[in-house]
C-alpha cells in the first residue's frame, strides 16, 4: 500500500492533466478573477491585462509568444500584488513581454515563479513601491535568461531578489538590471551576460564557493551602486565595469593586510584590483588607468546586505575609459504601459423600450473607473437617441440616345467631363444650339475649391536649454487655374465657327507630405571629474510635392479665300506654360552657447548648423521671403545691395536679404542677377552654315548670348526644307478624308495638307478628341441629314464610362419604308472592341440585338490632403443597339441605343449594433426591384469602429445581385456575425449566439413579389480535434421576422437526425406571441418538425437577448453533421416578403458535449443547388460574406470561443484521484 506522501506525489503528477487556456485577442480583466488548473498560452499579437486582482495564483505552464504580452498590475494603494506561478513539472517560457507592477501599493508585494524550467528570451519587468520589503524570486532547476530581467523599487528596502534553485546553476546570457534593489547570489552563475546595478543597487555574491564564470560581467552604472563578495570562499576574479565616482567594491570582512601585502593592491599593468582580509582575498578586473592614490577604504551601509565596517573600497576619481560590453548597455525602457489601468470611456448602442412599449435605439457614453473603494465600476454619462439612417442610391437608368446623321455624314455630339467628389467639385454642362450650317459648340467649366497662392512649412527643432533653431525653408507657389481660349474660323461660301473654353484642371489643393525625423545623440566625456555633455542633432527632412496639372496649347488659325483660289494662312501657336520652378541655395547658421556652472559639473550646449536642409522652391517672378530665426536677442532683416569683385577683377553689384543681429550681419539669400544686366553681356540674332552628314550645306539661324569671348546659342530657329523641288509652289490647307481601319471600319481624319502640283503631303494630322459622351434624350425624331439641336433637352440622362475616339455614321437610308438600311458606325473603346461594321435591318418595333462593349475601368482620383483621397470607380458599360424605328408618315426615324450603366435602384438601411464590443460590420441591404433578367451591381456599406455612421464607406462590387434567364429566383444575403462571450471573473461561457441578417431578393416571374424565402444551414466541426458527444444535447433557438413589417408568418422546419426521441411540446411565449410545435421521431429515420409560428400585428420585441422582432422556436436534438431548413412563407401567400429578415441563432451545449474551439456554420439559400465547402475565418476578423452567382460560393461563418475548463471535468478528475487514493490506502 502506498504511503500518504506517495499519494500526494501521485496527485501532483496528475495535476498537469488539464486544458490549455489560449489568449488570441486583447483581453482586460478587472477585479476578482478565479484561476483554474490549466496551462496558459498568449498568442502573438494579443495581450492579457489583469488589473486589481490582488491574489493571482496560476497553476500550470505559461507560454508568452513573440509580440504577445502579459500584464498583472494593481492600482490600489491598499492591497499589493501577490503573484505566484506554480507548476512543479511545468515550463515558464516568455518570448514577449511580462510585467508585474504594484508600484501604486503601499504594502509589500510578492512575485514568485516556481517551475521546473524557466526560459526568458523577451522582457520581464518586476516593479514595487519599496515602502516595505518585497519578495521577487524566480526558482527553477533549469534556469536560462537570454533577454532582459528588470527588478525595480521606488525606494530601497531590505527585500532581495533571488534567482535559481539553491546550490544550483543559472545561465545568464542576457541582462539582469537592478534599480533600488539587492540581488543575492545563491547559485552558480554561467554564461556571458551582465548584471547591471543602478540607483542605489547592490550585487551581493553571498556564496563564492559556487563559482561565477569569468565571462560574466558586473556593471556599476552610477555613483550609488556597489558590489560585495563573500570573503570565506576560494579566490575568484570578477569583471567589474564602471568603478569610480564614489561607487564601491567590498568584502564581507574588513579590509586588513598582512605582513607581506597591504589591504588592497592595484596592478596598473593588468588592471586587477586585489582586496584582502589578512589571508582571504578576492580579485576584481576593473581595467587600466586608475590612480592608486584615489582609492579609499569605506563602509557600505546599504539595506539588505551585511554592512561591514571598513570593508569596501571606493575610487574618488572618474571612471577611466574602457569599452563596455554591448550586453551591459542599459535599456532605456524601464517599464511598459499597462492597458486597462486608467479610466476609459466608450460609446455603446443599445435598444430600450419606452413607456408606450415602443423600442428605440440609443447611444450611451459609458465610463469605466474606480470608486472610492477602489472597485472598478461602469456608469452611463450621456444617453442620446439616434434615428435609423437611410441612404438612397440613384435608380437604375435606361438610357436612350439618338444617333443622328448629318449632311457630311459626320456625327457631332456634345460631350462633358464629369467628376464627383466629397468636397463638392462642381461640374456645369452647357449645350449651345447649333444652326444647320454650324458645328456643335461646347463649353466645359470645372470649378474646384480655392487654392492658396503659397503654402509654407515651418520646421521647429528644439534643442537643450531653450535653444531653438527655427526654419521656414519651403515656399511652394501654386498658380490659379489658367484658361485657354481658342477659336477656329474659316471664310468661304459657308462659314463655320466654334469657340471652346477649357479650364485647366488642378487638384483641389496640392498634396504635400513632409517627414521630419530628429535624432539626438548624447556623448559623455569625463576628464578630471568635469563632465562635458555634447548634444548633436541629426535632422532628416524630406518633402514630397505632388501636383497634377495640364497645359493646353492655343491654336489661332485664320483662312482667307478669294475668287482666284489664292489664299494665305497665318498660323499662330501660343502655349500656356506651367509655372517654372528653380532652386536657390539657402544656408543659415544659428549658434547659441549657454553655459551653466555648478560645484560638480559644467555643461556646454551648442546647436548644430542646418546648412544641409533642402533649398526652397520659388517661382521666377515671386520674391523670396523667409522668417527670421528666433533668438533671445533682437534681430531684423532687410534687403540691401553691395559690390563684389569677381575672379576677373571686375566689380559687380549683388543684392540679397540680410539678417542683422546687433553688430553681426549674415547673408541669408543672394538674388540671382539677370543675364542682360551682366557686364559685357549682349544678345543678338545670327545666321551660320552647317554641313550635314551627307555633305550638304544648310543655313541655320538663332539667338546668340555673348559675354566677352564667350557666346552661347540660346535658340535655333527651325529651318524649312530646301530640298523640296516644288517648295516655292507649295500651298497648305486643312482637309478632311476618310480612312478604312484594319477591321474594316471607316473613320474620318483631318489635318493640314501641303499640295504642289500633283503631290500632296500630310503635314499634320489632328488627333481624335478623347471625351466621355453624354447621351441626351429627345422625344421628337428628325429627318435624315438634319441636326435640330433646339429640340434636344439640356439635361443629360447619364454619362457613359467609356472613352470613345470617334463615331462615324454614313447615311445610306432610302426614304421609303420596307426597304433595307445599312447603318455603319464604329465607336472605338479602350480595348479596341468595335461594334459590327455593317448592320442590315428592316424597320421593326420589336426586333433588337444586344452587343456588349466592355470599356476600360476609369479611376478618377482627386487629392484632398495628406493621407486621404477620394476615388471614383466607373463600372463596365453595356451598349444595347436596337433597330431603328421608321415612320413613313414624315420620313423620320430614330436609332436607339440602350445603355445599362450598372447602377442599382435600392435603399440601404444601416442598423446600429447593440454589441459595442463587437467589430462586426453593420450591413443591411434591400433587394433588386428590377426584372429577373436584369444585371446590375450594388455597393455594400461597411461602418468601421472609427467611422461615423452617418458617413458610411462605399465599396464597389463586394456583393452581387444577379439572376439569369434560366432561373426565376435570385438570391443575395449577408451574414453579419456578432458574438458575445460573457466573462464573469474569468469564466467563459461555451454557449454560442449568432445574430445575422438574411437578405432576400426574390421575385417570381409574374407578380415580381417574393412569396417564400428558404434557407438551409449546417453545423459541422472544422477540424478533427473537436470532440462531439453523440449522446449529448444541443438546444437550438432560431428566430426570423419580417423587417419593419408586422404581419403573420408561417414557419416550417425540416430536420434530419441520426438519433432522437419522441417529443411533443407546446410553448407559450409572452408579449402576444404564441408557438405550437409538434415533433414526431422514429429511431434511425428522419425527424420532421413542424412549427407554426404566429406573430401578431404590431408585436413588440421578444424578451430574448435580441433586438429582432419575432417568435423564438427551440428544438432539442443531437444534430452532429445535420442539415436544417427554415422557410418563411406568408400565411396568405400574398404578402411580399422581398425585404430582409432578422434572425437570431442560439446554440446552448450541455456541459458534456460542447468541447470545441471552433464551430463552423453555413447558411445556404434553397435556390443554390450546389454547396461548396465554407472557408473558416476567425470571428475576430468580423468578415462579411456574400453568396456567389449560382451557388459558386457559400458563405461561411465561424465563431471562435475560448476553451474553458468545464466544471464537470475537474470534478471527474478529482473523483478519479480520490478513488486512486482510497485504493492506495
UniProtKB/Swiss-Prot annotation:
Lipid sites, type GPI-anchor amidated serine: 1195
Keyword set, alphabetical order: Cell wall, Glycoprotein, GPI-anchor, Lipoprotein, Membrane, Secreted, Signal, Virulence
Biased segments, Low complexity type: 838-852
Residues making up the propeptide: 1196-1225
Glycosylation sites: 97, 200, 488, 595, 634, 694, 933, 1035, 1133, 1150, 1182, 1193
Triggers of expression: Constitutive expression independent of white/opaque switching or mating type locus.
PTM comment text: The GPI-anchor is attached to the protein in the endoplasmic reticulum and serves to target the protein to the cell surface. There, the glucosamine-inositol phospholipid moiety is cleaved off and the GPI-modified mannoprotein is covalently attached via its lipidless GPI glycan remnant to the 1,6-beta-glucan of the outer cell wall layer.
Function in brief: GPI-anchored cell wall protein involved in cell wall organization, hyphal growth, as well as in host-fungal interaction and virulence.
Protein name: Hyphally regulated cell wall protein 4
Amino acid at each position: 500500500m502506498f504511503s500518504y506522501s506517495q499519494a500526494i506525489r501521485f496527485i501532483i503528477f496528475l495535476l498537469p492533466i488539464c486544458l490549455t487556456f489560449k489568449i488570441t485577442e486583447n483581453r482586460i480583466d478587472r477585479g476578482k478573477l478565479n484561476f483554474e488548473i490549466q496551462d496558459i498560452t498568449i498568442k502573438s499579437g494579443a495581450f492579457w491585462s489583469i488589473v486589481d486582482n490582488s491574489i493571482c495564483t496560476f497553476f500550470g505552464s505559461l507560454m508568452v509568444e513573440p509580440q504577445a504580452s502579459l500584464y498583472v498590475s494593481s492600482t490600489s494603494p491598499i492591497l499589493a500584488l501577490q503573484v505566484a506561478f506554480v507548476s512543479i513539472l511545468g515550463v515558464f517560457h516568455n518570448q514577449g513581454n511580462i510585467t508585474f507592477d504594484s508600484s501604486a501599493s503601499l504594502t509589500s508585494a510578492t512575485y514568485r515563479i516556481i517551475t521546473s524550467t524557466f526560459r526568458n528570451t523577451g522582457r520581464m519587468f518586476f516593479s514595487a513601491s519599496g515602502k516595505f520589503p518585497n519578495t521577487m524570486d524566480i526558482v527553477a532547476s533549469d534556469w536560462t535568461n537570454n533577454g532582459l530581467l528588470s527588478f525595480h523599487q521606488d525606494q530601497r528596502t531590505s527585500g532581495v531578489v533571488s534567482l535559481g534553485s539553491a546550490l544550483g546553476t543559472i545561465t545568464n546570457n542576457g541582462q539582469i538590471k537592478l534599480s533600488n534593489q539587492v540581488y543575492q547570489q545563491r547559485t552558480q552563475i554561467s554564461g556571458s551576460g551582465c548584471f547591471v546595478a543602478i540607483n542605489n543597487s547592490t550585487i551581493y555574491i553571498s556564496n563564492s564557493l559556487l563559482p561565477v564564470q569569468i565571462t560574466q560581467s558586473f556593471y556599476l552604472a552610477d555613483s550609488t551602486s556597489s558590489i560585495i563578495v563573500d570573503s570565506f570562499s576560494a579566490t575568484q576574479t570578477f569583471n567589474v565595469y564602471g568603478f569610480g565616482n564614489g561607487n564601491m567594491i567590498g568584502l564581507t570582512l574588513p579590509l586588513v593586510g598582512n605582513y607581506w601585502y597591504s589591504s588592497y593592491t592595484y596592478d596598473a599593468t593588468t588592471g586587477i584590483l586585489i582586496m584582502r582580509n589578512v589571508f582571504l582575498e578576492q580579485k576584481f578586473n576593473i581595467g587600466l588607468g586608475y590612480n592608486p592614490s584615489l582609492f579609499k577604504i569605506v563602509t557600505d551601509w546599504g539595506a539588505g546586505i551585511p554592512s561591514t565596517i571598513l570593508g569596501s573600497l571606493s575610487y574618488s576619481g572618474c571612471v577611466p575609459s574602457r569599452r563596455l560590453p554591448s550586453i551591459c548597455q542599459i535599456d532605456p525602457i524601464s517599464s511598459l504601459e499597462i492597458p486597462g489601468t486608467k479610466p476609459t470611456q466608450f460609446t455603446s448602442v443599445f435598444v430600450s423600450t419606452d413607456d408606450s412599449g415602443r423600442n428605440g435605439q440609443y447611444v450611451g457614453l459609458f465610463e469605466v473607473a474606480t470608486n472610492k473603494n477602489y472597485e472598478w465600476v461602469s456608469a452611463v454619462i450621456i444617453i442620446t437617441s439616434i434615428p435609423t439612417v437611410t441612404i438612397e442610391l440613384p435608380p437604375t437608368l435606361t438610357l436612350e440616345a439618338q444617333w443622328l446623321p448629318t449632311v457630311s455624314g459626320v456625327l457631332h455630339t456634345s460631350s462633358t467631363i464629369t467628376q464627383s467628389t466629397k468636397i463638392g467639385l462642381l461640374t456645369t454642362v452647357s449645350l449651345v444650339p447649333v444652326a444647320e450650317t454650324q458645328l456643335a459648340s461646347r463649353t466645359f467649366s470645372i470649378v474646384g475649391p480655392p487654392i492658396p497662392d503659397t503654402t509654407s512649412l515651418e520646421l521647429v527643432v528644439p534643442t537643450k536649454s531653450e535653444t531653438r533653431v527655427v526654419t521656414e525653408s519651403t515656399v511652394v507657389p501654386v498658380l490659379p487655374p489658367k484658361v485657354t481660349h481658342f477659336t477656329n474660323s474659316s471664310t468661304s461660301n459657308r462659314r463655320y465657327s466654334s469657340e471652346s473654353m477649357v479650364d485647366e484642371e488642378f487638384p483641389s489643393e496640392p498634396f504635400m507630405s513632409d517627414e521630419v525625423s530628429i535624432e539626438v545623440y548624447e556623448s559623455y566625456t569625463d576628464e578630471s571629474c568635469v563632465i562635458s555633455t555634447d548634444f548633436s542633432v541629426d535632422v532628416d527632412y524630406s518633402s514630397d510635392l505632388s501636383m497634377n496639372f495640364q497645359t493646353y496649347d492655343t491654336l489661332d488659325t485664320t483662312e482667307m479665300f478669294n475668287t482666284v483660289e489664292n489664299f494665305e494662312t497665318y498660323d499662330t501657336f501660343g502655349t500656356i506654360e506651367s509655372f517654372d520652378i528653380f532652386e536657390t541655395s539657402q544656408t543659415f547658421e544659428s549658434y547659441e552657447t549657454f553655459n551653466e556652472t555648478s560645484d560638480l559639473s559644467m555643461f556646454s550646449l551648442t546647436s548644430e548648423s542646418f546648412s544641409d536642409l533642402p533649398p526652397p522652391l520659388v517661382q521666377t517672378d515671386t520674391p523670396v521671403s523667409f522668417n527670421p530665426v528666433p533668438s533671445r536677442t533682437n534681430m531684423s532683416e532687410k534687403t540691401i545691395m553691395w559690390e563684389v569683385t569677381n575672379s576677373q577683377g571686375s566689380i559687380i553689384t549683388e543684392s540679397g536679404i540680410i539678417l542683422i543681429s546687433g553688430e553681426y550681419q549674415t547673408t541669408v539669400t543672394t538674388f540671382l542677377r539677370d543675364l542682360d544686366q551682366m557686364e559685357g553681356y549682349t544678345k543678338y540674332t545670327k545666321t551660320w552654315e552647317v554641313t550635314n552628314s551627307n555633305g550638304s550645306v544648310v543655313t541655320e539661324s538663332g539667338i546668340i548670348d555673348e559675354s566677352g569671348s564667350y557666346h552661347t546659342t540660346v535658340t535655333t530657329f527651325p529651318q524649312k526644307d530646301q530640298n523640296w523641288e516644288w517648295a516655292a509652289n507649295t500651298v497648305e490647307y486643312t482637309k478632311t478624308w476618310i480612312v478604312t481601319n484594319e477591321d474594316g471600319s471607316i473613320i474620318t481624319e483631318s489635318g493640314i495638307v501641303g499640295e504642289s502640283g500633283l503631290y500632296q503631303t500630310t503635314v499634320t494630322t489632328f488627333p481624335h478628341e478623347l471625351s466621355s459622351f453624354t447621351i441626351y434624350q429627345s422625344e421628337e425624331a428628325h429627318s435624315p441629314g438634319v441636326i435640330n439641336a433646339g429640340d434636344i433637352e439640356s439635361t443629360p440622362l447619364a454619362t457613359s464610362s467609356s472613352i470613345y475616339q470617334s463615331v462615324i455614321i454614313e447615311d445610306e437610308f432610302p426614304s421609303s419604308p420596307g426597304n433595307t438600311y445599312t447603318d455603319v458606325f464604329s465607336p472605338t473603346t479602350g480595348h479596341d472592341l468595335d461594334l459590327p461594321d455593317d448592320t442590315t435591318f428592316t424597320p421593326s418595333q420589336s426586333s433588337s440585338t444586344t452587343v456588349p462593349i466592355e470599356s476600360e475601368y476609369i479611376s478618377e482620383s482627386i487629392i484632398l490632403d495628406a493621407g486621404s483621397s477620394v476615388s471614383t470607380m466607373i463600372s463596365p458599360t453595356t451598349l444595347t443597339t436596337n433597330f431603328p424605328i421608321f415612320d413613313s408618315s414624315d420620313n423620320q426615324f430614330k436609332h436607339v441605343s440602350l445603355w445599362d450603366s450598372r447602377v442599382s435602384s435600392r435603399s440601404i438601411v444601416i442598423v446600429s449594433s447593440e454589441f459595442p464590443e463587437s467589430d462586426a460590420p453593420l450591413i443591411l441591404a434591400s433587394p433588386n426591384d428590377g426584372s429577373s433578367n436584369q444585371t446590375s451591381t450594388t455597393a455594400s456599406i461597411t461602418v468601421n469602429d472609427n467611422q461615423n455612421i452617418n458617413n458610411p464607406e462605399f465599396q464597389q462590387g463586394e456583393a452581387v445581385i444577379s439572376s439569369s434567364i434560366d432561373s426565376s429566383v435570385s438570391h443575395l444575403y449577408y451574414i453579419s456575425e456578432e458574438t458575445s462571450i460573457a466573462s464573469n471573473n474569468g469564466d467563459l461561457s461555451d454557449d454560442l449566439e449568432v445574430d445575422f441578417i438574411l437578405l432576400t431578393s426574390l421575385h417570381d416571374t409574374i407578380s415580381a413579389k417574393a412569396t417564400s424565402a428558404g434557407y438551409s444551414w449546417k453545423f459541422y466541426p472544422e477540424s478533427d480535434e473537436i470532440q462531439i458527444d453523440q449522446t449529448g444535447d444541443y438546444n437550438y433557438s432560431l428566430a426570423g421576422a419580417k423587417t419593419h413589417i408586422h404581419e403573420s408568418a408561417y414557419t416550417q422546419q425540416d430536420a434530419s437526425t441520426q438519433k432522437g426521441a419522441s417529443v411533443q411540446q407546446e410553448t407559450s411565449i409572452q408579449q402576444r406571441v404564441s408557438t405550437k410545435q409538434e415533433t414526431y421521431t422514429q429511431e434511425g429515420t428522419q425527424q420532421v418538425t413542424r412549427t407554426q409560428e404566429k406573430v401578431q400585428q404590431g408585436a413588440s420585441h421578444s424578451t430574448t437577448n435580441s433586438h429582432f422582432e419575432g417568435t423564438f422556436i427551440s428544438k432539442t436534438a443531437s444534430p452532429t453533421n445535420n442539415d436544417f431548413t427554415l422557410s418563411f412563407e406568408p400565411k396568405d401567400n400574398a404578402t411580399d416578403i422581398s425585404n430582409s429578415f432578422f434572425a437570431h441563432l442560439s446554440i446552448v451545449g450541455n456541459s458534456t458535449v460542447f468541447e470545441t474551439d471552433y464551430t463552423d456554420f453555413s447558411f445556404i439559400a434553397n435556390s443554390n443547388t450546389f454547396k461548396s465547402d465554407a472557408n473558416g475565418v476567425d470571428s475576430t476578423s468580423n468578415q462579411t460574406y456574400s453568396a456567389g452567382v449560382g451557388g459558386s460560393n457559400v458563405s461561411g461563418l465561424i465563431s471562435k470561443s475560448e476553451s474553458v475548463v468545464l466544471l464537470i471535468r475537474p470534478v471527474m478528475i478529482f473523483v478519479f484521484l480520490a478513488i486512486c487514493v482510497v485504493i492506495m490506502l
